Amino acid sequence: SQLQTTFNTRRVEIQQTNAGIEPEQVLVIETIGSIKNFANAVKRIVGLEWMGEIEIDEILPDEDFYDEKHPEKNLNGRLFFIMTNQRALEEMLSLWQRYQSEPAMQFERGLTKFRDVFSYLKSIHRWDVQDRLLETGLIDIWQEDLDTDGNRVIQFEAELWFRKSAALQVASASYVSQLVEEAGGRILSQSVIDGIAYHGLLAELPASAERSIIDDPSTELVKCENVMFFRPTGQMVVGDTSPEGD
């Protein structure tokens, strides 16, 4: 299979941050326990020992995975598997979904090593609504703001996947702007900082649109694959370009 070939030839990049990632090529891997424990475990899997040789930059718990009773404990780790081979990526996703439905399933010859990897994982998925919106705390902040003033217009940041091409940056920002406007909002400013691979839009939405997203995050705007994160404005990198980039 393409999946076997890709892993056997090590045509997979594994990294702990999403810097420089093309969203079409990434699978988000959430580990049960820390990255260090995962790396130590996969070192013992024949054929995948190399996966345990990733440079561990052990990240302290952030608000996404914070355990109040044990603040020093790393509850979950997150890795990004980058594959240029789309067939291999789809095969891995499909294999994981089958395993989730039937953990005792029989793996085809050559794929049993993935069963061993899967036992250390909590989730494998494409970058989705969960990553874009639900883990940044924006929904809770919107709810608090609307509880205080039910009619307020609220600003937020949409951080886009960084594209090196200026034409792709314009196209990406234009599409997100269109979705914001269709939801009744508008773009206030845009910031592109090449040095840190950052592209962000400062936007605002009316209360009605925010309530719709709180009730059902799977809106066209939140599902937009051009967006990496939706964040509260306090977390935004400050820039000085207009929405048109002037």
Predicted features along the sequence, with ranges:
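Calcium-regulated, polybasic anionic-phospholipid
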Residues: 35-43
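Residue-level signal for secondary-structure boundary sites
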Residues: 166-168, 211
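Autoinhibitory propeptides
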Residues: 1-16, 27, 46-154, 174-245
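Short glycine-/aliphatic-rich beta-strand segments at the starts of folded cytosolic domains
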Residues: 17-33, 145-166
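Well-ordered, non-membrane alpha-helical segments in soluble/globular domains
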Residues: 38, 168-177
